[in-house]
Amino acid sequence: MAVGLNKKEIDGPASQRAVACDLEPALPPIGARVTLNYPGKMDESIILQKKDTKYLRVGSDFAKESSLILPNSFIWSDNSLALNRLMVEGKKAKLIYLDPPYATGMGFSSRSNEHAYDDCLTEAAYLEFMRRRLILMREILDDDGTIYVHIGHQMLGELKCLLDEIFGRERFINLITRRKCSSKNSTKNNFANLNDYILCYSKGKKYIWNRPLKKPDAEWLAKEYPKTDSKGQFKLVPIHAPGVRHGATGGEWKGMLPPPGKHWQYTPEKLDILDASGDIHWSKTGNPRRKVYLTDDKSIGYTDYWEEFRDAHHQSILVTGYPTEKNFNMMKLIVGASSNPGDLVIDPFCGSGSTLHAASLLQRKWIGIDESLFAAKTVMKRFAIGRAPMGDYVNTSLNKQTELPLSLNETARHEYVSNDFNIYVDELTASVSKNELAEIQKAYRDLKANQQ
């Protein structure tokens, strides 16, 4: 008996694919993980080695060694050292939010021209800088915790790969696009850059989620509830549902049966009541649908496009004057969605302290980390006297927050909730930055004086 392939098999798709394999090397096996490779990529076991970094608790006129970092604290330190310390202490956060440098190659200063930080790392150095810190954050994040990484377009793709590598691709929750500013009519050679992004990952399969809701805008309401009558604005929905039923909801109503494979959502008696009250709409072809009226408490969930959280864009918005300060309402939404009262929230690049402020208002515990002296002073000033309207930072007749009219200071101060505020500094920073430490102590004295 002859054995072999017939002409159809020889010329068929399977045979052609086999020939193509000889022309192109085999693809990686299904399920193979993607990793980033670059010079200087440190072994994870080295990153997770415990460091014996001593931290000093700072007071108005002292700085003494502390065995434990308390909740509701700002840590003035390199965040890799501080995160390692929190890991060693066994701290567990339900939420970590970070707004790190974006690899822009730029320096950033405040509205009063005080230097805040340099964003000078690029490519491999930037990725390894972030990787080492994200690995430590993974260890600190609780099993039902969530991490939000706020980033620009510059390293978005690379950071997505990095987060997939560290947390697992299956732990990806969302890529949120945020409208950060108004239209830029001056852009000529490319599309205007109006957005930045938030990568959201969970530590485990289950995570805290308190679904945030908002009031729909007029455009959405007009599309969703396009009809009106004497009772108000309404939309039409079917009165049948999938599935065959053999009871009353599968029988006749007003001489007609449900469509094939479906049943009435209500009994014929209930449908009669709805029809008599004018809550059934009959089309010209005799198709009945139920009217669903718009209610005053109507709310909808957020999508992954956030256009209502632009950064300060008019002069009445309250700000600290810190560069890259993020929208405070956005921070309250994130903290509320991914943590519960009493949970620990950590921001390792805390800058102006928006995350800490939101956590405090929503009765969460918090820890903020930043190595910038200006960030440290900004956070303490924020907790002492609150923020100021943005217009005051361009009004030369006022000396920023310190010379605001009392009424404005009192209004801003009402944002603050707790008097519980601690500040720590690592021993090395304290020893080599004595003048800066003195500034920190002065700011701390001012904070405590304003909290009386």
From Swiss-Prot:
PROSITE patterns: N6_MTASE
Molecular-function GO terms, alphabetical: DNA binding; N-methyltransferase activity; site-specific DNA-methyltransferase (adenine-specific) activity
Alphabetic keyword roster: DNA-binding, Methyltransferase, Restriction system, S-adenosyl-L-methionine, Transferase
Protein name from the UniProt record: Type II methyltransferase M.EcaI
This enzyme's EC code(s): 2.1.1.72
Reactions the enzyme catalyzes: a 2'-deoxyadenosine in DNA + S-adenosyl-L-methionine = an N(6)-methyl-2'-deoxyadenosine in DNA + S-adenosyl-L-homocysteine + H(+)
InterPro entries the record matches: DNA_methylase_N4/N6 (IPR002941), DNA_methylase_N6_adenine_CS (IPR002052), N4/N6-MTase_EcoPI_Mod-like (IPR002295), SAM-dependent_MTases_sf (IPR029063)
Pfam families: N6_N4_Mtase
Class of the enzyme per the UniProt entry, highest EC level: transferase
